[in-house]
Amino acid sequence: MSLPEKAFPVSWDQFHRDARALAWRLADNGQEWRAMVCITRGGLVPAAIVSRELNIRMIETVCIASYHDYDTQGQMKVLKSISPEIAKSGGEGVLIVDDLTDTGKTAAEVRAMLPKAHFAAVYAKPKGRPLVDTFVTEVSQDTWIYFPWDLGFTYQEPIAKGTRG
């Protein structure tokens, strides 16, 4: 796989710094979070870092598949919903965390589930930016972010090659 013209490769160190910067911004918000919902799979790594920094212990996941191939976004499919215990308040006191808000489709889907929640992402693109409350870095819509869990020294196919997003 060749890198597109506007590639933004992110190292583990860079991602860790950016996720901690997100935690700092959220801490400055002054909000007490009763729970965190991370959007899997991309939100797992920043959720681990942010939850540690903000001492959030109740962590839930929501799984929405939108990339059925590595680089092709398709129809949204909810693979795992948010627990009724977290969802019952409409998201009040809940922090949603993801790595990136790109087109905003996934964010809109989760926002509909938790309309009162605070949505945070490490990176945001212009189409998804209106749906996120807190983010660290904005990149152009035509930039492809290469996350460290997708890369080795070159692009790495997932071990389970036959699986889709």
Swiss-Prot record:
Chief location bin: membrane
UniProt keywords, alphabetically: Cell inner membrane, Cell membrane, Glycosyltransferase, Magnesium, Membrane, Metal-binding, Purine salvage, Transferase
Binding positions for xanthine per the UniProt entry: D102, I145
Cystine pairings recorded for this chain: none
GO BP terms: GMP salvage; purine ribonucleoside salvage; XMP salvage
One GO MF term: xanthine phosphoribosyltransferase activity
Protein name: Xanthine-guanine phosphoribosyltransferase
Species, as recorded: Sinorhizobium medicae (strain WSM419) (Ensifer medicae)
UniProt gene name: gpt
